[in-house]
Amino acid sequence: MESSSSSSYIPFIRQIAASVSAASCDAVVGGGGDKDEECRDEAAALRLKMVAVAAILIAGAAGVAIPLVGRRRRGGGGGGGGGASSGGLFVLAKAFAAGVILATGFVHMLHDAEHALSNPCLPHSPWRRFPFPGFVAMLAALATLVVDFVGTHFYERKHRQEEAAAAAEEAAAALLEDGGALPVGDGEGRDGRGGKRDAMHIVGIHAHAAAHRHSHAHVHGACHGGAVNDAHAHGHGHGHEEGPSARHVVVSQILELGIVSHSVIIGLSLGVSQSPCTIKPLVAALSFHQFFEGFALGGCISEAQLKNFSAFLMAFFFAITTPAGITVGAAVASFYNPNSPRALVVEGILDSMSAGILIYMALVDLIAADFLSRKMSCNPRLQVGSYIALFLGAMAMAALALWA
């Protein structure tokens, strides 16, 4: 039984390999290509591509920069009331961005993957015998879960070690200043009997345990008057509150991977087109698309509290990916055939992977993490505003599917 089932997979895999290595099939696509041929104008298309590169670059850079600059100004500002209001505004903006990412995965990426892998240029078997887009998206979502877990565990352990070392050094320095309970004689830590190193270790353990207990008691308190006592939680639990930034680092990096992988395909598809009729509506649609995605990514990067150079690097790579794809597409347009089976399979697989990554990130790391948090449940006004922002973001991005 097992040998017969395993042997049935072999022809299936051979069919996939044979279909990818097949020749181009422009004749099959003739029904949809006539309009493009009538509107074909390489000079006008090249001018529009240059406009698209500039517009998409500016839109993407602006989208990713707004949350980064806003978060930095909020962090640098000294006002207490302004910080609270801008904090609520940031939560609303993040909810809007989560809706954008969710719609990108479901409405744009899955649809594009289905369109590529059901193209008439690909043989019916195996590409229409099995739902490859959904299957690859599922595998990508599961792989993202594993990477999310492993990455978060790694960053949190590293952060705890750094925190414990810093607490031990501070406590030991304080005791030395007070002339307290450390042996002065042979205290260089060479022998393991009550030297400075052992004292620092013991002090560090006690300091960390006390801070952990103190922070736990205040951060997880009940709602007071419909909202969490943020000032109290922040004042006494600051050391413990820094922990989530490790998770935000992983979230921002995985989200960038999902966005960048499909941005390359989008840019390449626009770059190889020689039809102004196709390119013209895409310029505005992709500019809005890039702005919304940049806004979502910028919010995650700012929450990760990365160093300025790391944040700039992530924002820079996001902003240039689609314009770079357009440039490469324009350069290879004379000999690249987007209807070749190999190009269609690569596009469909990458779009499916991007869909799985973005759907997982939107539902698990953006929507569930914020909408099920105590801060949200203790603030009904913030709850209502966040749901409205979430639906607005999803609807705005879904509407772009009419043009993009």
UniProtKB/Swiss-Prot annotation:
Segments on the Extracellular face: 23-49, 108-129, 270-280, 333-343
Assigned keywords, A-Z: Cell membrane, Ion transport, Membrane, Signal, Transmembrane, Transmembrane helix, Transport, Zinc, Zinc transport
Keyword match Transmembrane: yes
Signal peptide stretch: 1-22
Membrane-related topology note: Multi-pass membrane protein
GO molecular function: zinc ion transmembrane transporter activity
Ranges facing Cytoplasmic side: 71-86, 151-248, 302-311, 365-383
Keyword DNA damage assigned: no
Compartments where found: Cell membrane
Pfam families: Zip (PF02535)
Main function: Zinc transporter that may be involved in zinc uptake from the rhizosphere.
Protein family according to the UniProt entry: Belongs to the ZIP transporter (TC 2.A.5) family.
Annotated NCBIfam families: zip
The name this protein goes by in its record: Zinc transporter 10
Provenance organism: Oryza sativa subsp. japonica (Rice)
Lineage, highest ranks first: Eukaryota, Viridiplantae, Streptophyta, Embryophyta, Tracheophyta
